[in-house]
Amino acid sequence: MTFPATDGITDRLQALFAYDASSPLIFSSGLFLFLFAGFLLVYSAFRRAPMARIVYVIAFSLYFYYKSSGIYFLLLVFAAASDFLIARGIYRARFRWTKRWLVVLSVAVNLGMLGYFKYTNFLIDISNQLFGQGFLQFQNIFLPVGISFFVFQSMSYTIDIYRGQLKPLSNWLDYLFYLSFFPQLVAGPIVRARDFIPQIRQNPVVVTREMFGTGVFLILTGLFKKAIISDYISLNFVDRIFDEPLLYSGFECLMGIYGYALQIYCDFSGYSDMAIGIALLLGFRFPKNFDAPYKSATITEFWRRWHISLSTWLRDYLYISLGGNRKGRIRTYGNLLLTMLLGGLWHGAAVRFILWGALHGAALALHKLWMAVVPGAKATGDQMHWWSRAAGIFFTFNLVCLGWLMFRAESMQTVELMLHQIFYNFNAAMIPQVVSGYAGAFALIAAGFLLHLMPGRADRFAQRLVSHAPLVLQIVMAAAMIWCVMQVKSSDIQPFIYFQF
């Protein structure tokens, strides 16, 4: 005899431990919030037991990654074992050439993993275009979530040890903890070993009132950005425009591009906010990953504000390794272009990502040339007159949006069609009708940009207000935010955009 209630519980438990590619465990899901509450309760019992805490967090982190990528969580374990051993070999090696070969081995293993899973079919497609369809057969290769992030994070560890900037860990579990720590595992920020590792064995774990309040604030703002702004405008406006641009006027196509600029910012910075906030609740500090990038008055400033952990990684481990700005002006421009081309390729195996990287690389090189030949040219808006800064923000934002058009479009034909509609079929007379027809989406787009462009002191004031509020009030605010999310969310899970990278 079976009991329906028992069957229901069994089904839910099976779903809890089964991998489902269509239902990854993401920060904005009710399941994650429920699991994290339970995790946090047990975690607090280990605040004075470093080893038990490390094992407990690793177990939850691997479970978290398993729910996103299935059996490929073993790839993460392999990467941790490989670079842990290689790093110790680098540190112990007596000869410079031995150290060099070992760091090359680390880079080869990491890029080999990344290349196989991410770029095999891209290279097969290029080969078929060059030598005829059917020259090579496409492979059914699964792309593990966030592989680009943990590969870069692991490479930075071995490179820092090779450069003599870091000593290797003696305990493999500490390194596995660093590489698999679930808040930043699948979409960053890319955390440097020298910043994070000293925090692992803190005893006891200290979560101050300021850390707890700031963590709550960041989780709530991240949830708002992702589930209310990004997901809503994506499903109800942006996706429709990019799917069938010829069905829409040039104004709608332009607003679709602007909407995507806000969508990807709210999606990615929302994840980063939640990751940083969750880490704070666990007693860890992550670096800031976004700093109001659409306030940038130059493309150089944009890359100091957008995905800061990636841009600094590319600067420290690629641009400087290529020679940086130490080899003359022409070499500097070439290094910038190559760095951003590879940065574009890091985002995905498609021509559109390479073109996106090329656009940004060329823009950075031209801006550096501009500063070299024009007296008084500035690198950031803070150094400009207000009118020059306003013009710079307008120009930089639209240049970045041109890049987002390439980044989002499924093909270059979509790029051409949307630009054609904007320049030849703008149809300004339809603007009032379009705005009223998409009132909800346009209201959220306007609100999102207004909040983004507010002075930094307003954001800091709101953060202090929430972080210093009584615990009961913080709980009420969290419950209210979750209720709002439930009212506007789609029935389908909307993964974070950067999960695919």
Show the residue positions of the predicted features.
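Membrane-embedded transmembrane alpha-helical bundles that form the catalytic cores
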Residues: 2-451, 455-500
